[in-house]
């Protein structure tokens, strides 16, 4: 599939709109926007996003994810199609949500490895967010795509960057090594710049697909969540990203502004971001966000 076809499928297949903007009738004070741009590398777009609302078992869910593929887009595409379904199929999703997410991450990775002849030798990072009834946000991630929360204009990182240097002992305990070549970032076995990922069959014995997971209450101080691939975080800090978009009323415009700023700062990677926006009651009459 050509890069342009992939981008088109991303836009029309996930939010039900080609504008990159979504709104739920149930949560009239919550909206989301997203945007993405292909990097300067000579390969098709490898970032995939999910940004949608759905009702499951009588609960209203917001599902948000960034999948940043490497060495091909097939694993990221597979995750876009299957990971949330696998999470929601876990029998204990409503009683032990974190355990359900962890099990789904690991079992999904097992399927990806089994299908490596079809899906290729590459892999993908993932950061996922499940918003439950507008009250609780559960974040999980492997790799270096991030989720950042803004409360009263202050950035707080909800995900964990799984850098090889931080997990060197675990990698070495599995028989791998972390390279530290001057002028380059640390890499697992001299190849991969993240210590946790989906796929990557040739490196998997030295990698993990076990996610870091945390939950956050959504309260009146919560303004928005920012999900973005590392093409953003290579060129700006969490607070710089929040400061850039916190005064923008339309979440799609906010996502677009963030990507344009990353490109202007010479980010050359594929970049994707999602901005779920929470309208505080006192601001409903003042702020347009749909």
Swiss-Prot record:
Domain PPM-type phosphatase: 31-278
Alphabetically ordered keywords of this record: Hydrolase, Magnesium, Manganese, Metal-binding, Protein phosphatase
Induction: By the avirulence factor AvrRpm1 (at protein level).
Chemical reaction(s) catalysed: O-phospho-L-seryl-[protein] + H2O = L-seryl-[protein] + phosphate; O-phospho-L-threonyl-[protein] + H2O = L-threonyl-[protein] + phosphate
One Pfam family, short name: PP2C
Cofactor binding annotation: Binds 2 magnesium or manganese ions per subunit.
SMART domains given in the database record: PP2Cc
Cofactor(s) the protein needs: Mg(2+); Mn(2+)
CDD domains assigned: PP2Cc
Coiled coil: none
Keyword Magnesium applies: yes
GO MF annotation terms: metal ion binding; protein serine/threonine phosphatase activity
Binding site for Mn(2+) 2: 68, 230, 269
Binding site for Mn(2+) 1: 68-69
Gene Ontology cellular component annotations, sorted alphabetically: mitochondrion
EC number: 3.1.3.16
Matching InterPro entries: PP2C, PPM-type-like_dom_sf, PPM-type_phosphatase-like_dom
Protein family per UniProt: Belongs to the PP2C family.
Function according to Swiss-Prot or TrEMBL: May be involved in defense signaling.
Designated name of the protein: Probable protein phosphatase 2C 20
Organism annotation: Arabidopsis thaliana
